[in-house]
Amino acid sequence: MSAFKRTHYDLNRPGLLHQQVAMAEFIELGHFQSTIRQARATYAQRRQALLQALAPCLGLQAHISGTEQGLHLCLHLPHNLDDVALAQQAQDHGLTVRALSRYAIARNDLRGLVIGYGYAPLEAIQKDGPVLAQLVLRALRHRHA
């Protein structure tokens, strides 16, 4: 079967009409918009809890970006801080964060943590956010020692 025929079949296979009708009704009745509104409120709460937990880190050569949208934010750290080691320390405490330097291709001076909050329950952020903040504070202080 050619790629064109497979694609044509996938786009027009039987059974999709019922799903499309159900989805159209879901949207028309306002359920989709309601779901989106609830999700936005949930993620805003999580983002705010994470920002509150990380507040003690700010001002010590650290700042946050990515708070306007998305399901993660970036905690930018000084260029001479080992963000890979810091991410590993967080992992050792059961926290999942990513080293910003792992995402940099053209620059070798970017350091920080990419912190996702979309999958984490609010209670976990409230409990574990301060743990992450303490790890960051310790790394910032030891960098100067």
Predicted regions and their residues:
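Residue-level recognition of strand-loop junctions within catalytic nucleotide-signaling folds
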Residues: 28, 76-78, 118-120
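Conserved glycine-rich beta-strand-loop-beta hairpin in the small C-terminal domain of fold type I
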Residues: 41-51, 62-76, 86
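Residue-level detector of anion-binding/catalytic polar loops
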Residues: 96
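Conserved core segment of the aminotransferase class I/II
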Residues: 1-40
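PLP-dependent enzyme catalytic core of the Aspartate aminotransferase-like
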Residues: 92, 106-145
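Short, solvent-exposed loop/turn elements at beta->coil junctions and helix N-caps
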Residues: 61, 101-105
